[in-house]
Structure formats: structure tokens, C-alpha cells
């Protein structure tokens, strides 16, 4: 690996070209596959030839202040025929060096793209650096790069107040990309007002009452619901022009401190500024999307909440603002002549304020029972193994769900549910055998796919089969995503399962119009559902399986105008150009909603990988949500470090799944994944009623050889742990997680407790140190409790149970 003396200059305003003392730093988990080189005129280039994740840090860590406004300019050009896509983003850190966001201000790049954007340093950020990152081959010449501070939203400079309450509030009291107030906020005359407001984002306008928006018609149907009101809203743009707007519905809040309920274990009271809980969505909308389907706040002794109807979502975020005295939802909407309307539904409701966000979740579940409906009563582990016939002692592992169709009769005999595999938004095109190992460009891939499309026919070989290459190619012509320049979005790839081209597709069922051969029809084949599910459930095929449900490799936005009319859900807009686009979240939503409705109509089930992570709106249509997970990180020349999922992420997933099975597949280098790690994995999963299984470690050389259930050295070593923990996990999962714990309460924040069904409660030490906890037993007259992990009986004294738990250890109590 050659890293030349390519240097930057750091000035008071940031980074720009020149002589200095810092070099772009590559990172990649493969050796000898990335190089950074000097070019003429002070430019530089990079080339990555491997297949795994990579990054080139463009700057060192810069010291910044909240509220600082920066401009970022980058111009790239092609280096050679390697045209792989990559992204440019900022990595944010707090004052202690803890990473806060690895993909802030994310920009999708390709050689030849010029980016000029600005951002404001968010709350709590002390340092940041810029980087390129990607997956697979990529190369580009970087002709211009500049990161400069151009001002601050605080004219006199940022000074944090000394009072703890004000200091915390001031950290967020400025406009960011996702803010509601600040430079583009509510005018003073609208503060404290409720109702609908509209902002013309492209014109950098203020929020105005919807009645002042002459180009828009708003239709609202209001109806009573349990504890509140439902709003069925349609917005129509009348001019036929491309538009980018933010539609707001706000609830006025009374005077006094506002308690913002951010997570199930965290609430914050504030008196100035704004609070939001959202996740990055790249260049879609204003860049941030609400993680939860609802938001909750209490103020003046009253509880206020807003929530989205899962049958009619759009790109949205929630927040509470103490300055404007409003709880609000914002929808970032795009309009075009091909798609001039947007339809959303949401609720304005109340909840039990004493239970904070858990109380709001109870109320939201009551409003949306179908979202949390449990269709699968018997739970178990998930596997994607091609064959289980030769796995000895199969019953010890507790399998229930299979993401492969290779042994349907065997599955029926062993009470396993079999799901048919599809992956929305991708088409992995393997090159012809004679081309393998040779140079293959995206242009070559396009020509090859055109040949396949012309060849035909497009009929499926059978109702259960995957599509033929010819059928895929026909769908590709209709559904391929296009970037801001109108180019088809794809990349060359060399993976263990595909050497060739990966195309990214808009998989919504309406693309191309009625009867079109689009990606949805290619993969789901609705016309074959009667034949596919001809046997009575659970005999034969049991449902549909959606891999990569949150579409990790798909670009945030589809700019193809020919796709706009085919979307049922609202468009959004590109953050930087304000052009109307299709957000990939709604592509996944429309694909999974339509396919799941077909499956449920046949009495079948649905399984998905990689959700819920950032998107809540897929789970309502799933019966078995799951995710591959990575809880270990490779270290240097060998070994791994243990980095499990944190409580906040775990509770988000558990909350969105409700009583549905929450399944995991651990991906790890199993040469270094110890028996102790397996037990930690099982104990943490048990604490949340999740179902822990294993898969592999991805990569061309390790994928097949590292599959856990093909390694007797792993599964035989861990067999006693499966026999001990999986039955307990299944018992809790089938009992069903409860939002409010009416059995136990902990006095130690490092020791959490959750309830399952009517009689089970888990107690878990989150920390890496022993913890003592006093558990208040909430039901009266309980003298003893059965503990199921250590198989003991615990005595309750005066309504209290005292425990000392080792690090990362769980206990399960059964109430008689």
C-alpha cells in the first residue's frame, strides 16, 4: 500500500488544498487493495480493488463548536474505467471522543460529481472529520476539496450557559438540517398555535398557515379515535411544477417545562430550545427521519402525543419546541406533475403520563392493533442453512423458521416453517462463465442485460422458483433506479455469490403501470400465488421472506421521473437540489406491504432480514422480523472484541415487534467467537425475549467455510447452551413482551427488568461490572419466586427482592 506525501493545510476556517502536515488515511479490512496517490496540480486520487468496506479519511479530527456553520465543496473526476459509487460524509464525536454519527451529511458520490453543500454542527459535537467510504471497487481523482467554517448561528459566539438545565437545552437551541425552528422556523405570530402549516423548502421560506399557500389544496377528514383524533390528509399541488415542501401539524403546548419522552428509559425536561429523536437518511428530505412512529411529551400536567398510521406513512419527523410551545410532526413532501398529490394519516392522542413513552406506546398499540397482531403462535430460531438433514441432534437447536426452500418436505416433517426468498431493490447479475476473472465494467453489464431482456421468455419455471435471468432483465428495464444525472444506478461487484454487476431497482408494485413487468412482478409473481400456496397451511411453502429489508446498498433517492406515477406513497425531495424523488424507505414499504397482503390473504406468514433497525414502518406487515447482527469486531492480526447491541437499540426493536418473534443471526469470525461469547449472546437475547441464532462471516474467502452450523467445533461446543437458553427464549417470546412492567421495578439503572406475558419478568445487568439491585415486587402477597436460569427459588422480603448479578447476566422470574 502506497500512501504518498499528500498534504492539507488547516486554517482557522477549515481544510483546503496546500502544503501542510496531514495525509489522507485509508482503512480497509483487506491488505493491499487500496492506494492513495498524488496527482498533478495538487489533486490526489484513490483506488480500491477489494470487495469489503473501505474508507479514506480526508481530514484529521477538527475541533468544532455546536452551531458552527460549514461549507463543504468536493469535485471528482474519473480515474479509469473503475466507476464504482462511494459516499462522502462526516464522522462526529463528542468531547470524550465517543462516536455520535458515522454518516452525517452523507453525499452519494461517483466520479465526475461535484458537491457543494453546507451544514451546521449539531448538538454535543466537539470534533469531526470528513471521509470517503464504500463497498467494493471504486476509484476517483479528487480535484477539489474544501471544508471551511463560514460562520455560526450564534452571532456572538457559542457560550454554554452554566446552569445545568439551560446548558443542556442550549446544546440543541439552533437550527440543524432537521430542525423545525431557527432560520426557517415558525414566525412569532404562529408560536403557540395549532393546526397545519406549510413551508416552501426550495424557496427557503418560513412556515405559513396552509390557507396562505395558494398553489396547494389541503383536504382533511377528522374522526374520533380512542383517546384522541385521527386526521386523514391529502395535499394537492395545483401548478404542475416540481415542489419541495414541509407540511407541519402542530399541537399547542401549555406554559411550563416540557418533558420530552425520547426512549423507553429516557425522558428530558427542558424550558428552551427543541428536542427531536430521528435517524439519518442521507439526502432524502431534510436528511432526518423519525425513528419511532409516534412522539410524546407531557406539559402542564397533561400528556400529548402524535403518531403515524402505518397504512399511510410518508417521510416524517417529530419534535417538541419550548420556544414555539408546540409538539409537531413534519412531513417532507415532493410534488411533480407525474405525482401531484400526497396522502398521509396520523393521530393526535393522549396517554398515561405516569408511564412516559411506555404509556404512549400502550396508547399507540391500542390505535393500531393490526400493526402488532401476532399470527405465529409457536416461536423458535431462524436459519438460512441450505440443508439441515445432516445436522445431528437437530431438536437441540430449537429451529422454527427457514429462509430456504431446499427441503420443504423435511421441514414439514420437523415442524419447521419454510419461506420463499426475495431481496427487494437488487439484481445481482453474474457475468458469463467465459468472462469470469476478466475486466468487466458497468457498461459491459448494461449491454449484457439488454441482451438478456431481448432474449425472453419471461415466464417463471414454477410457482416456487426464482425468476429467470430473462425475466429479471425485463424488470430491470422498467425499474432500475436513476441518479441525479439520469444514469442507471449500479456497481461492479465480486462477492462469494456474484461476480458481475449489482443493479439497484425501484421495487414498488406500481412501477411501469398496470401489468408492467417490473421488479415487484419479477420477484413476487402475484399471478402464481394460488399455485404457490395450494396446500393447506402449514403444509408446503409457508410464506414470503424479504432479505435486506432496509435496503442497505440502495441509494437514498430515486430520481427517475418515470417512476413517480407508480408510487402510492408520497414523494419526498432531494436535500440539496430540492428535486422531487422517491425515497427508498417507501420503495421497501410498498414492496413489503403488497407482498405481505398477498401472503396473508392465503393464510401465510412473512419473514424479513435487517429490520427494524432505522425504519419502523415495515414491521406492521411482518410476522417474523429479524436481523443479521455483528456483535464482535476484528482486532489487528487476530481475535475479536465484544461489542453487543446497546439497550436503546434493543428496546426499540423489541417495542416495534411487540409480541412477534424477534430473531437474530449472529455474523462473526467463528474461529475467534468463544463459548463465553455465545453464552453472553444468549443471556442478552433472553433478557429481551429475542431468539438468537447464527450465520457466517461475509467475504469471498470466508463465507462458505465459516457458516456456523457447518462447523461441528462450534455447534457441538455450544450445544449445552442451546439446550439451556433457547427453550427459555422461546417461552418468553411466545408469552409476549409487555410495554409496562407490572411485576418488578429496579432501583439500579444498570439493572433493567422487562415483563413477558402475565407471569414472567427478566432482570439483566447491562454493565461489565457486578451490580446489586433491590427489586420491588409489584404484585401483593408474593413470598417466593421461581428463577429459571439458575433454577432456584428466591425469597421476597417485605415486597423486595435483593440480588447481586455478575456482569451481563440475566435472571428470569416466574410468578405463580
Language-model regions, residue ranges each:
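Extracellular and organelle-lumenal recognition/adhesion modules and their flexible linkers in secreted
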Residues: 17-205, 226
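Active-site neighborhood of glycoside hydrolase catalytic domains
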Residues: 523-618
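C-terminal beta-strand-rich structural cap/linker in extracellular carbohydrate-active enzymes
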Residues: 797-816
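Active-site-adjacent "subsite" loops/lids of carbohydrate-active enzymes
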Residues: 420-538
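Asparagine-centered strand-capping/turn motif at beta-strand->loop junctions
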Residues: 134, 235-239, 763-767
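Active-site-proximal substrate-binding groove within the catalytic cores of carbohydrate-active enzymes
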Residues: 338-349, 354, 413, 584-776, ...
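Carbohydrate-recognition beta-sandwich/jelly-roll modules
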Residues: 101-104, 148, 152-156, 161, ...
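The substrate-binding groove and active-site-proximal loops of carbohydrate-active enzymes
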Residues: 379-388, 395-403, 499-535, 573-588, ...
Amino acid at each position: 500500500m502506497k500512501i504518498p506525501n499528500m498534504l492539507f493545510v488547516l486554517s482557522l476556517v477549515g481544510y483546503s488544498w496546500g502544503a501542510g502536515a496531514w495525509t489522507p488515511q485509508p482503512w480497509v479490512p483487506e491488505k493491499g487493495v487500496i492506494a492513495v496517490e498524488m496527482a498533478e496540480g495538487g489533486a490526489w486520487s484513490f483506488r480500491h480493488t477489494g470487495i469489503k468496506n473501505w474508507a479514506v479519511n480526508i481530514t484529521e479530527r477538527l475541533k468544532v463548536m455546536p452551531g458552527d456553520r460549514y461549507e463543504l465543496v468536493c469535485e471528482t473526476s474519473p480515474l479509469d474505467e473503475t466507476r464504482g459509487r462511494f459516499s462522502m460524509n462526516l464522522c462526529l464525536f463528542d468531547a470524550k471522543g465517543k462516536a455520535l454519527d458515522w454518516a452525517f451529511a452523507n453525499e452519494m458520490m461517483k466520479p465526475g460529481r461535484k458537491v457543494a453543500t453546507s451544514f451546521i454542527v449539531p448538538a454535543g459535537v466537539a470534533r469531526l472529520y470528513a471521509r470517503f467510504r464504500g463497498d467494493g471497487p471504486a476509484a476517483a481523482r479528487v480535484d477539489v476539496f474544501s471544508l471551511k467554517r463560514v460562520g455560526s448561528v450564534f452571532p456572538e459566539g457559542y457560550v454554554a450557559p452554566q446552569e445545568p438545565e439551560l446548558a443542556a437545552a442550549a446544546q440543541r437551541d439552533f437550527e440543524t438540517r432537521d430542525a423545525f425552528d431557527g432560520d426557517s422556523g415558525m414566525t412569532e405570530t404562529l408560536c403557540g398555535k395549532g393546526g397545519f402549516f406549510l413551508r416552501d423548502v426550495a424557496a427557503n421560506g418560513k412556515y405559513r398557515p396552509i390557507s396562505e399557500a395558494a398553489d396547494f389544496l389541503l383536504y382533511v377528514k377528522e374522526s374520533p379515535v380512542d383517546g384522541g383524533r385521527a386526521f386523514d390528509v391529502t395535499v394537492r399541488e395545483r401548478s404542475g411544477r416540481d415542489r419541495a415542501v414541509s407540511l407541519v401539524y402542530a399541537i399547542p403546548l401549555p406554559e411550563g417545562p416540557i418533558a420530552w419522552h425520547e426512549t423507553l428509559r429516557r425522558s428530558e425536561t427542558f424550558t428552551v430550545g427543541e428536542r427531536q429523536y430521528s435517524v439519518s437518511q442521507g439526502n432524502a428530505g431534510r436528511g432526518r427521519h423519525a425513528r419511532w412512529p409516534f412522539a410524546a411529551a407531557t406539559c402542564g400536567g397533561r400528556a400529548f402525543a402524535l403518531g403515524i398510521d402505518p397504512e399511510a406513512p410518508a417521510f416524517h419527523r417529530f419534535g417538541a419546541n419550548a420556544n414555539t410551545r408546540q409538539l409537531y410532526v413534519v412531513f417532507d413532501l415532493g410534488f411533480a406533475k407525474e405525482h401531484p398529490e400526497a396522502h398521509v394519516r396520523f393521530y393526535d392522542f393522549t396517554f398515561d403520563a405516569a408511564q412516559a413513552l411506555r404509556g404512549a406506546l400502550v396508547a399507540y398499540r391500542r390505535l393500531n392493533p393490526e400493526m402488532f397482531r401476532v399470527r405465529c403462535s409457536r416461536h423458535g430460531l431462524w436459519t438460512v442453512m441450505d440443508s439441515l438433514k445432516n445436522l445431528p441432534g437437530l431438536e437441540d437447536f430449537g429451529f422454527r423458521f427457514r429462509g430456504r426452500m431446499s427441503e420443504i418436505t423435511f421441514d414439514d416433517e420437523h415442524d419447521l416453517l419454510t419461506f420463499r426468498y426475495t431481496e427487494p431493490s437488487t439484481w445481482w447479475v453474474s457475468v458469463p462463465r467465459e468472462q469470469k476473472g476478466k475486466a468487466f465494467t458497468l457498461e459491459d453489464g448494461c449491454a449484457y442485460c439488454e441482451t438478456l431482456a431481448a432474449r425472453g421468455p419471461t415466464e417463471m419455471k414454477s410457482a416456487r422458483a426464482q425468476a429467470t435471468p430473462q425475466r429479471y432483465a425485463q424488470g430491470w428495464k422498467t425499474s432500475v433506479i436513476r441518479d441525479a444525472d439520469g444514469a442507471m444506478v449500479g456497481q461492479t461487484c465480486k462477492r462469494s455469490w456474484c461476480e458481475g454487476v449489482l443493479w439497484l431497482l425501484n421495487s414498488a408494485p406500481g412501477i411501469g403501470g398496470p401489468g408492467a413487468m417490473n421488479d415487484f412482478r419479477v420477484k413476487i409473481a402475484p399471478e402464481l400465488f394460488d399455485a404457490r400456496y395450494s396446500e393447506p397451511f402449514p403444509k408446503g411453502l409457508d410464506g414470503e421472506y424479504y432479505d435486506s429489508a432496509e435496503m442497505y446498498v440502495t441509494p437514498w433517492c430515486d430520481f427517475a421521473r418515470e417512476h413517480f406515477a407508480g408510487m402510492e406513497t408520497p414523494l419526498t425531495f432531494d436535500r440539496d437540489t430540492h428535486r422531487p424523488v422517491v425515497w427508498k424507505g417507501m420503495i421497501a414499504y410498498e414492496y413489503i406491504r403488497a407482498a405481505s397482503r398477498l401472503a396473508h390473504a392465503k393464510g401465510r406468514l412473512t419473514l424479513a432480514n435487517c429490520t427494524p433497525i432505522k425504519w419502523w414502518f415495515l414491521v406492521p406487515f411482518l410476522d417474523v422480523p429479524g436481523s443479521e447482527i455483528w456483535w464482535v469486531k476484528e482486532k489487528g492480526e487476530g481475535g475479536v472484541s465484544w461489542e453487543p447491541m446497546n439497550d436503546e437499540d434493543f428496546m426499540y426493536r423489541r417495542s416495534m415487534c411487540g409480541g412477534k418473534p424477534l430473531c437474530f443471526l449472529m455474523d462473526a469470525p467463528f474461529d475467534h467467537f468463544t463459548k463465553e461469547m455465545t453464552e453472553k449472546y444468549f443471556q442478552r437475547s433472553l433478557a429481551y425475549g429475542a431468539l438468537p441464532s447464527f450465520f457466517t462471516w461475509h467475504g469471498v474467502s470466508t463465507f462458505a467455510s465459516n457458516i456456523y452450523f457447518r462447523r461441528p467445533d462450534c455447534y457441538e461446543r455450544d450445544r449445552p447452551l442451546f439446550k439451556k437458553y433457547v427453550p427459555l427464549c422461546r417461552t418468553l417470546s411466545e408469552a409476549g413482551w409487555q410495554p409496562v412492567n407490572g411485576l418488578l421495578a429496579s432501583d439500579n439503572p444498570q439493572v433493567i427488568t422487562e415483563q413477558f406475558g402475565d407471569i414472567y419478568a427478566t432482570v439483566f445487568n447491562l454493565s461489565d461490572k457486578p451490580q446489586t439491585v433491590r427489586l420491588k415486587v409489584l404484585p401483593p402477597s408474593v413470598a417466593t419466586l421461581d428463577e429459571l436460569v439458575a433454577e432456584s427459588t428466591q425469597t421476597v422480603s417485605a415486597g423486595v427482592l435483593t440480588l447481586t448479578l455478575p456482569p451481563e447476566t440475566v435472571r428470569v422470574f416466574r410468578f405463580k
